[in-house]
Regions:
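Acidic/polar low-complexity segments and flexible, solvent-exposed patches
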Residues: 308-435
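A short linear hydrophobic-aromatic micro-motif
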Residues: 162-167, 208-210, 368-373
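Polyanion/phosphate-binding surface patch
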Residues: 51-84
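Short secondary-structure junctions
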Residues: 47-49, 158-164, 205, 361-367
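Short beta-strand
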Residues: 56-59, 165-171, 211-215
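A short beta-strand motif that forms the metal-chelation/ATP-contact edge
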Residues: 176-182, 221-225, 383-389
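C-terminal accessory nucleic-acid interaction domains of nucleic acid-metabolism proteins
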Residues: 1-29, 35, 46, 50-51, ...
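Signature for HUH/AEP ssDNA processing cores
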Residues: 97-170, 181-189, 325-328
Length: 435
């Protein structure tokens, strides 16, 4: 079995190390299969992720193993791999990969980057997004038909303000609607425009959709406006997703949403669909629209008493935003929440939930799917998993008290280790002689 295979891509040689390494155990698909997939749909993938800075999301052990986010481009890279320097809200900066051609996609696949995670800006203007992203994220227990209904209302709102929405499956359980916009507005303005969409959709169908940021307050389909904040990325069109069946994020027409099944779009099936239909988002760049009408809607919402909505925790507090929780104290929840556990591996955190259910079977019998809150917590190098339970549907006399976490893995140790290494680097290697 070859330890390396070389792909010739438009005159460039791309090496795939360990090409037969299985990345998807359920389907048996390998790293070489991943590289060949991205070559088969390269033009469509570059329409979504090309010419933009990309975060590398790497799965060296495949789906089910540990994965990590890599913002900084590897130092060892071909000279034809381009990078651009980004400044983040945290104050840090990093040089990120800018794929320009099919060879770059194959090179990223060799790093076991299953997903394509581009920023909504072009490399030649990092301050003005040209893409507005409406992320429809269903809470547990919500299925495709309800997502489909909400997407139709999103389309209606966009149509009314003169914008063209381009739908695609998320590659997981939800849907994305991307909108090409003129490069005239800041990240904050684009986020405010999407928040206006979310609130208008929620107003029209309050039982189906929500714009509530806190998980325990959500129902139905959450419209995640914060995916438009600076430093946030979303899987782009044709991106493979880390699901057991190797699903991909599939561009759709509005007409086929009614009858399609997101599970039908996979690493194995998408190349044939692409060869038959081409890129359904190929005309997106011809429909760059204006945010003026959405920002006017946002101003009317604000006049009606709707100020800004919560930002991701690591962002600086914004004017008009409600008070945030100080880092030294907990936010006072509106619902009876208890935390079950947190772990590096999602499976370990969910195993702790099953142990909790076994200990508290009477309470567990009253839980609804949306009462199980599984949070991804961004660590220094990877995403950790926290599991909480909302006891709102459990009779008060049956509600368990907060117990010691199980499992109780401390994600802050990861940051502490980085700080310790930095401190050691700053310490002189030789002690100063005493005077």
């Amino acid at each position: 079995m070859s330890e390396q295979e070389t792909l010739e891509v438009a005159g460039r040689a791309v090496s795939v190390s360990n090409p037969h390494k299985v990345l998807f155990p359920q389907t048996g698909q390998t790293k070489l299969d991943l590289a060949r997939y991205y070559l088969a749909i390269a033009e469509g993938a570059l329409q979504g992720a090309g010419h933009r800075p990309n975060v590398l999301v790497r799965y060296p052990d495949g789906v089910g193993g540990e994965f990590f986010y890599q913002k900084r481009a590897p130092r060892s890279r071909p000279e034809w791999i381009e990078v651009v320097s980004l400044q983040f809200p945290s104050g840090r900066s990093a040089e990120e990969i800018v794929p320009r051609d099919a060879a770059a996609l194959a090179w990223m696949a060799n790093l076991a980057c299953l997903e394509l995670h581009p920023h909504p800006v072009r490399a030649d203007d990092l301050d003005h997004p040209d893409e507005l992203r409406v992320d429809l994220d269903p809470v547990p227990g919500v299925d495709w038909p309800q997502i489909r209904e909400v997407s139709a209302i999103v389309k209606a709102v966009l149509d009314e303000v003169g914008l063209t929405g381009w739908p695609k499956t998320s590659g997981s359980r939800g849907m994305h609607v991307f909108v090409r916009i003129q490069r005239r507005w800041t990240f904050d303005q684009v986020r405010r425009a999407v928040l206006a969409v979310a609130r208008e959709v929620e107003r029209r169908t309050p039982t189906l959709a929500t714009s509530k940021w806190w998980k325990e307050e959500r129902h139905g389909v959450f419209i995640d406006y914060n995916q438009n904040a600076k430093d946030r990325t979303v899987a782009s069109a044709y991106s493979v997703r880390p699901t057991a069946d190797a699903r991909v994020s599939a561009p759709l027409t509005w007409e086929e949403i009614a009858d399609c099944n997101p599970a039908d779009f996979t690493l194995a099936t998408m190349p044939a669909r692409y060869a038959r239909l081409g890129d359904l988002h190929r005309d997106m760049d011809r429909h760059a629209g204006s945010l003026d009408a959405l920002l006017e809607l946002s101003a009317r919402q604000q006049a009606d008493g709707l100020g800004d909505a919560p930002w991701p925790p690591h962002y600086r507090k914004q004017p008009g935003e409600a008070s945030r929780v100080a880092p030294s104290r907990r936010r006072m929840p509106k619902h009876p929440l208890i935390e079950i556990g947190r772990a590096r591996e999602k499976a370990d955190a969910l195993a702790g939930l099953e142990r909790w259910k076994a200990r508290h079977s009477a309470a567990a019998a009253h839980l609804e799917p949306a009462d199980i809150l599984v949070d991804g917590l961004r660590g220094r190098f990877r995403t950790w998993t926290r599991v909480r339970v909302n006891l709102q549907h459990v009779p008060p006399e049956l509600r368990p008290v907060q117990e010691p976490l199980d499992p109780d893995e401390n994600m802050h140790d990861e940051w502490r280790a980085v700080s310790d290494r930095s401190a050691r680097r700053r310490t002189p290697s030789r002690a100063r002689k005493a005077p």
